[in-house]
Amino acid sequence: MINRRQLLQGGAATILTASVVGVSSKETPQLEIIDTNLSLFQWPFRRLPLDDTGLLIKKMRALGITQGWAGSLEAILHRDLSSVNRRLVEVCSHHPELTPIGSINPTLPDWQGDLSRCSKKFKMPGIRLHPSYHGYTLSDRFFAQILEQATKAGLFVQVAITMEDLRTQHSRMRVPDVDLTPLPRVMRNHPGARVQILNLRPKAAQIDLLAKIHGVYLDTSRVEGTDGVPALLGKMPAGSVLFGTHAPLLIPEAALIRTHESSILDEKDLCALFVGNAQAFLGA
């Protein structure tokens, strides 16, 4: 069995594939990895090792991550999200590995225009929401309106449940996790919507709730334990779990290590988790 050092020094995608098919990494074509949960720029409350885009790209390449869906950390506190999204697109245009995911704050004027620009001007595949930071809940009319307009525009919607652990949050800005309880009702009213929940630390009751909702997907960034990812795959509908790291707020190696050290996923499972499910989500 390969160890962590081999995994992280040898190119994660190639090493992971070789380990499950039982051949040497030299004989194995590199497995694609799509990271559905990246962010660019600086976190407002502290510097992070990978908050420089060049360093983040270098780390992605070292780990074999071939594509990253990137939101903007500027969206947390900035009010001019049109400019935030424009800067994101400009930076991503210089890095073919990055796919920009626009940010929408429905409590601000002209959020409908921001959503339209994400779709029509910037040709983004999806948008990202931060309800707790922007002051609304999933039961507010804003969320239903976003789902309706995003679905009409062919955009998926990512909902960041949290951005950092409560224990590390600034003492003057404690931000609770998003409450998922209203989600089943809202999704029933928007059957064509595609919603990916980001940064969820799955609990049994939450997974039981989410597994029953058509159109809901999860990422792996905060799944804990060496058996956490296989357990999540076993409880959620097929194709509904996508690989994500939550870099730069979390180190991307962590998500890869947890996936590898489960020693349960076979080649088919890995391919689906790393790339197939994300591709299907894009085309759904």
Task: Label the predicted regions.
Residues 122-126, 139-242:
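Catalytic pocket-lining loop regions of alpha/beta-barrel enzymes
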Residues 34-36, 69-71, 101-103, 128, ...:
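Active-site neighborhood of phospho(di)ester-bond hydrolases with catalytic His/Asp-centered motifs
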Residues 2-36, 45, 49-67, 238-240, ...:
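Mid-to-C-terminal alpha-helical segments outside catalytic/metal-binding sites
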Residues 37, 60, 88, 150, ...:
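Conserved, mostly hydrophobic/aromatic
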Residues 74, 104-109, 132-133, 200-204, ...:
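Short beta->alpha connector loops
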Residues 66-67, 75, 79-159, 163-165:
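Active-site gating/metal-coordination segments in enzymes
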Residues 37-41, 160:
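Histidine-centered divalent metal-coordination motifs
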Residues 42-44, 76, 165-170:
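A short acidic, helix-capping loop that chelates divalent metal ions and anchors anionic groups
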